[in-house]
């Protein structure tokens, strides 16, 4: 059975606009504006199922109001001092003041006449400035500025100050380390003065003035050469006692072997202190007696010694004393190492340790190392240029340090 169609209508979706709307649009241009009916807008499609409407966020009055700054407290009643307002405090610059001891022992590197021309005090200035003035004063007062300049420690980084020295026809500059305290300045100068063999040259406190201090220091300077050539009786006695303490323990040893020429000179010096020869022609030993009448306990042998008159001790003690010419060839010409020649250095190294350093003495003669060069030697230089191993190099550095600390 077929359904009857409506004429003039197609199959499919119905039109969006109704007939009334079509008529209104058709008559839009022909009719007047007053007779045009209102145009209706089709509805939008509805929301999907399970769609939730979000509630609008309500802005609170606090959030809508502009931000307010926290009221600052009233500081008018608070005392304005450094505790409450630290930003207003002006830091005070650190200053250092050093005093120069013109009566100190200047050592072999510095010249006393130039030292007397220096001011009594350096500063007050910044630590770096005072350190520069002190080191420059040491270089200016030196006999040979090149040696003192080589002992100055090189600095790096930060604020640098430099010192200068003129030698070999050129002007040489060297930067000093960064310093920021009084203690560092004193430690740096202490190490430098120890290398220059002139202790107690600088201090942060004034030196006590003495009337005869300058005269005594000058007498020590003038008599240094004579005291190096001729030893007094008191020095020989003190050296003999010191050697007996370490090398003449007769209560525990039956015999004593003398391996050092220095020990032979000291034992021969005992007989000269007694005023006569060490032994008689019959071979019996006489105890040395000083002028005071009582015998020295450091030189007297104990009665319980089993070999008091034995051949081992008597053979060494009765050895003929060497002539003055032989003694001069054995010991350096002066006690001041800065005046030593190459041969003096060779004798010093040979006497210091015959077993460890004796085979290497020719190297010092080959490289022409005199007294000044000996004081500048370090372990790395000895191993690199002289070819010594670490053990002999450390032993030699030990003897050089003892030589630097000795008073000439």
Swiss-Prot record:
- Residues forming the SAM domain are 340-406
Family annotation (InterPro entries): PcG_chromatin_remod_factors, SAM, SAM/pointed_sf, SAM_Scm-like, SCML2_RBR, SLED, SLED_sf
Where would you find this protein in the cell? Nucleus
Biased amino acid composition, Low complexity? 288-306
**GO terms for CC?**
nucleus
Q: Does this entry carry the keyword Transcription regulation?
A: yes
For the modification Phosphoserine, which residues carry it? 55, 65
Predominant location of this chain? Answer: nucleus
Enumerate the UniProt keywords alphabetically: Nucleus, Phosphoprotein, Repressor, Transcription, Transcription regulation
Q: Look up the signal peptide feature and give its range.
A: none
Chain intervals for the UniProt region annotation (Disordered)? 274-338
Start-end of Polar residues biased regions: 278-287
Q: Does the keyword Cell division apply?
A: no
Role: Putative Polycomb group (PcG) protein. PcG proteins act by forming multiprotein complexes, which are required to maintain the transcriptionally repressive state of homeotic genes throughout development.
Q: Which family does it belong to?
A: Belongs to the SCM family.
PANTHER family, alphabetized: POLYCOMB GROUP PROTEIN, SEX COMB ON MIDLEG-LIKE PROTEIN 4
What is the recorded name of this protein?
A: Sex comb on midleg-like protein 4
The record lists the organism as Mus musculus (Mouse)
The organism's taxonomic lineage, starting at the top: Eukaryota, Metazoa, Chordata, Craniata, Vertebrata
Coding gene?
Answer: Scml4
């Amino acid at each position: 059975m077929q359904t009857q169609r409506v004429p003039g209508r197609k199959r499919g979706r119905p039109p969006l606009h109704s007939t009334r709307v079509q008529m209104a649009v058709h008559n839009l241009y022909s009719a007047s504006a007053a007779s045009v009916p209102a145009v209706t807008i089709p509805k939008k499609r509805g929301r999907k199922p399970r769609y939730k409407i979000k509630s609008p966020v309500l802005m609170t009055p606090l959030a809508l109001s502009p931000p307010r700054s926290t009221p600052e407290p009233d500081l008018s009643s608070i005392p304005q001092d450094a505790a409450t307002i630290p930003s207003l405090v002006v830091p005070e610059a650190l200053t250092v003041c050093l005093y120069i001891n013109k009566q100190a022992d200047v050592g072999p590197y510095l010249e006393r006449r130039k030292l007397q021309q220096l001011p009594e005090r350096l500063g007050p200035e910044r630590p770096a400035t005072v350190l520069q003035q002190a080191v420059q004063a040491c270089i200016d007062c030196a006999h040979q500025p090149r040696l003192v300049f080589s002992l100055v420690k090189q600095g790096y980084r930060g604020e640098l100050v430099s010192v200068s020295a003129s030698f070999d026809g050129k002007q040489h500059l060297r930067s000093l380390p960064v310093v920021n305290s009084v203690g560092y300045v004193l430690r740096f100068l202490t190490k430098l003065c120890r290398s220059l063999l002139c202790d107690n040259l600088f201090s942060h406190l004034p030196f006590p003035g003495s009337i005869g201090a300058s005269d005594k220091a000058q007498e020590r300077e003038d008599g240094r050469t004579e005291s190096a050539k001729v030893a007094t009786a008191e020095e020989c006695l003190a050296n003999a006692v010191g050697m007996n303490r370490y090398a003449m323990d007769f209560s525990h040893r039956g015999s004593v072997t003398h391996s050092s020429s220095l020990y032979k000179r000291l034992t021969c010096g005992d007989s000269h202190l007694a005023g006569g020869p060490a032994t008689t022609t019959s071979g019996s030993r006489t105890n040395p007696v000083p002028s005071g009448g009582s015998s020295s306990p450091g030189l007297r042998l104990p009665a319980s010694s089993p070999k008091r008159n034995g051949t081992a001790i008597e053979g060494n003690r009765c050895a003929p004393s060497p002539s003055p010419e032989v003694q001069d060839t054995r010991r350096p010409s002066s006690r001041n190492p800065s005046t030593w020649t190459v041969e003096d250095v060779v004798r010093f190294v040979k006497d210091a340790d015959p077993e460890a350093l004796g085979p290497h003495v020719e190297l010092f003669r080959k490289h022409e190392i005199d007294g000044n060069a000996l004081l500048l030697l370090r372990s790395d230089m000895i191993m690199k240029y002289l070819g010594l191993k670490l053990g002999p190099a450390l032993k030699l550095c030990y003897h050089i340090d003892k030589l630097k600390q000795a008073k000439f």
